[in-house]
Design a protein with these regions (language model features):
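Histidine-acidic metal/acid-base catalytic patches
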Residues: 30, 55-77, 81-162
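Active-site acidic/histidine proton-transfer and metal-coordination neighborhood
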Residues: 1-74
Length: 162
């Protein structure tokens, strides 16, 4: 999976909103066409409103991906961003089932999973319920240090991955 996150740019930095969407769609389709040739997915990551000025929630992503309609582009969700943007993470995952191709996990404080207050039991139960078969990757800060973050992430994955 090739992940497109902040690389997509911001509407506020474009000439106009129309130009932004036109350019984003054109380039995503170009990437996805190439990805299809290589049997790879393009995952469009939803990023919270404090870091990106568009495509923040699962619903934003689903709406845009349905409009775009490319078979090699799917939805990439990240628990850290979902904690900020989604009123109901379980419902958002359920609604995203058809397009969800990649998941990042980090806790509410962006540390390794289990450090903050995220309900990962519910997240992994929901992923099981929607028959999600894609990858789950830890994307967390190396805090308090890389060794601790790494070992705690492995412990977390051993608990939830089966």
């Amino acid at each position: 999976v090739v992940i497109i996150g902040l690389l997509r740019g911001k509407i506020s930095e474009a000439d106009s909103p129309e130009h932004y969407w036109e350019r984003l769609s054109k380039h995503l389709i170009e990437c996805a066409d190439y990805a299809m040739e290589k049997h790879v997915w393009v995952g469009l990551e939803m990023i919270n409103r404090y870091e990106a000025d568009t495509l923040n929630s699962a619903q934003d992503g689903l709406r845009y991906l349905r409009e775009l309609g490319h078979p090699a582009i799917g939805l990439h969700l990240d628990s850290y961003h979902m904690n900020i943007e989604e009123a109901d993470i379980r419902a958002s995952l359920e609604q995203s089932a058809e397009k969800l191709i990649h998941v990042h996990v980090a806790d509410s404080d962006r540390y390794y999973p289990g450090h903050g207050h995220m309900d990962f039991k519910e997240i992994f139960e929901t992923l099981d319920e929607i028959s999600y078969t894609g990858a789950v990757a830890v994307e967390a800060l190396a805090k308090p240090d890389a060794r601790t973050a790494g070992s705690e992430s492995v412990r977390f994955l051993e608990k939830y991955m089966h």
